[in-house]
């Protein structure tokens, strides 16, 4: 297969059957590039309990995929939480990362958008009982937010200091994203020190970033990065 390969990192509670993952797999087949999509522990086809997971464990899953299933440099394409995990991979394994694309990347969301939005009663409940439930617009079932997710993700917050990368970074973000506001993307851009970092804001795109034009934009970015 052509080098570099591409690894797709999905979002929280998503699975590798999502629109973006399947689209990129087809793109890779057509272009002759190696491509990997996978499920984190407790997601999709993978074993394990979702509520026992955190950024710490899902980052380890991604690290295992990078180390054991790929060779050479990789383009990391991270959606939502996967954008946070892609940043961690680039930070810990810079020699293996060709470039990084964040799609509605959600670094530090467990702290900035979950914990910081909880009132005292919710914080007390999650600490004492181990979890709370929060409505989700993506499924009828509410999200189960665990104490594990909050506590163990704190070891891996990335927006508390500068992120120094030598690889190119592309951030794609929609204006109609109800989960990750555009400010998160601009804040991430501010924290990045990379010789080649760009943010593209797409008017009208939502958090799923899965319309035909959004998908084409993702593959266009990959094709441009391949030439670097």
List each model region and its residues:
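Short beta-strand element of the alpha/beta-hydrolase
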Residues: 3-11
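The serine-hydrolase catalytic nucleophile loop
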Residues: 12-25, 183
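Alpha/beta-hydrolase active-site loop signature
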Residues: 13, 40-45, 107, 206
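Conserved alpha/beta-hydrolase
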Residues: 25-47
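Catalytic nucleophile-loop/oxyanion-hole region of alpha/beta-hydrolase
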Residues: 44-69
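Alpha/beta-hydrolase fold nucleophile elbow
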Residues: 69-80
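Short glycine-enriched nucleophile-adjacent loop
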Residues: 83-94, 100
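The alpha/beta-hydrolase serine catalytic core
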Residues: 96-201, 206-228
């Amino acid at each position: 297969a052509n080098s570099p390969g591409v690894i797709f990192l999905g979002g929280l509670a998503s699975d590798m059957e999502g629109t973006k993952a399947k689209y990129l797999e087809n793109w890779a087949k057509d272009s002759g590039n190696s491509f990997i999509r996978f499920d984190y522990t407790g997601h999709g086809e993978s074993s394990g309990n979702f509520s026992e997971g955190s950024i710490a464990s899902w980052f380890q899953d991604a690290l295992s995929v990078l180390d054991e299933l790929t060779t050479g440099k990789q383009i990391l394409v991270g959606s939502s939480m996967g954008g946070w995990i892609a940043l961690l991979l680039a930070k810990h394994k810079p020699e293996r990362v060709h470039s990084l694309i964040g799609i509605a990347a959600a670094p530090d969301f467990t702290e900035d958008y979950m914990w910081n939005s909880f009132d005292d009663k919710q914080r007390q409940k999650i600490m004492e009982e181990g979890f709370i439930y929060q409505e989700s617009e993506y499924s009828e079932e509410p999200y189960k937010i665990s104490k594990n997710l909050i506590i163990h993700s704190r070891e891996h917050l990335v927006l508390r200091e500068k992120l120094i990368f030598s690889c190119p970074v592309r951030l794609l973000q929609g204006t109609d994203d109800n989960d990750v506001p555009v400010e998160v993307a601009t804040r991430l851009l501010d924290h990045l020190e990379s010789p080649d970092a760009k943010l593209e804001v797409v008017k009208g795109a939502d958090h799923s970033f899965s319309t035909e034009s959004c998908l084409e934009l993702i593959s266009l970015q990959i094709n441009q990065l391949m030439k670097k």
